[in-house]
């Protein structure tokens, strides 16, 4: 039998140190993993329509290079707002430690109503983030059972009921420490928070996150964008109409300089200098 001639690990060599804390980006931006921003995990579904529910892991649309499956209740752009703010608060301490805040302050940061309706909406979003499970892998390792991340976006949530007489009581959330894998040096994007909050259209918010992941966005077919956004528009014509309105909103906000949809139904956009400012903000 041939002998194993490989060298055993040297116990004196230090093991690679794994980061335990998220990057300390600037207060005016929010961090979002690129594979999530370039997928239909957070859809543009209408808040007046029932959310889909997937009992088994279902592969959702992403750009080439990644495979993302989801099980649980459909996540939408309001859930992305909550996730962005939660991750922002969590960056100040090691992952896995409790993240505490008042529901009042959280709602205020989101621009949501500080009312029973707002508290219930926030709690429902945390519930979805806790009970919806994702699996993310590269398209070269998806068949090997290796996942860059596997689990819920929120490990645990504790908060008082919306009708509590203590509106400024503490709510507490725990994140999975493994979520750090989604925030490597070139694996996440800084989203300009004030711009995002001013956008009232779910489609405009999605496009804002998506195009933030590219300094010079690649042209993309309207049909591809429809799939990535998770739009339920019955006809591509209807989606294209909404897309034009959303793109113009991004121009009005100073995020885009220009956009066109050419004769081949391909979307071309030009990021503005102001839109790229979030990329160069120092931490603090």
Labelled PLM ranges:
Residues 1-284:
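Charged, alpha-helix-forming regions
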């Amino acid at each position: 039998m041939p002998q194993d001639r490989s060298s055993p690990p040297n116990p004196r060599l230090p093991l690679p140190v794994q980061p335990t804390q998220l990057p300390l980006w600037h207060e005016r931006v929010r961090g979002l993993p690129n594979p999530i921003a370039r997928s239909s995990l957070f859809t543009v579904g209408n808040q007046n329509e029932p959310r889909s529910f997937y009992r088994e892991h279902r592969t959702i649309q992403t750009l080439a290079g990644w495979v993302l499956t989801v099980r649980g209740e459909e996540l939408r752009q309001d859930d992305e707002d909550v996730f962005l703010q939660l991750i922002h608060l969590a960056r100040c301490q090691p992952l896995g430690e409790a993240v505490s805040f008042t529901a009042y302050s959280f709602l205020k940061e989101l621009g949501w109503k500080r009312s029973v309706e707002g508290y219930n909406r926030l709690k429902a979003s945390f519930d979805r983030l806790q009970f919806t499970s994702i699996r993310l892998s590269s398209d070269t390792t998806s068949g090997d059972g290796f996942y860059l991340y596997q689990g819920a976006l929120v490990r645990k949530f504790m908060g008082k009921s919306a009708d509590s007489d203590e509106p400024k009581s503490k709510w507490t959330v725990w994140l999975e420490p493994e979520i750090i894998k989604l925030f490597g040096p070139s694996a996440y994007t800084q989203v300009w928070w004030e711009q995002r909050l001013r956008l009232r259209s779910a489609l405009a918010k999605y496009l804002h996150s998506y195009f933030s992941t590219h300094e010079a966005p690649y042209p993309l077919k309207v049909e591809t964008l429809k799939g990535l956004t998770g739009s339920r528009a019955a006809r591509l014509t209807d989606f294209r109409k909404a897309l034009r309105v959303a793109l113009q909103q991004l121009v009005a906000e100073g995020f885009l300089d220009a956009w066109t949809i050419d004769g081949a139904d391909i979307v071309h956009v030009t990021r503005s200098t102001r839109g790229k400012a979030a990329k160069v903000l120092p931490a603090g």
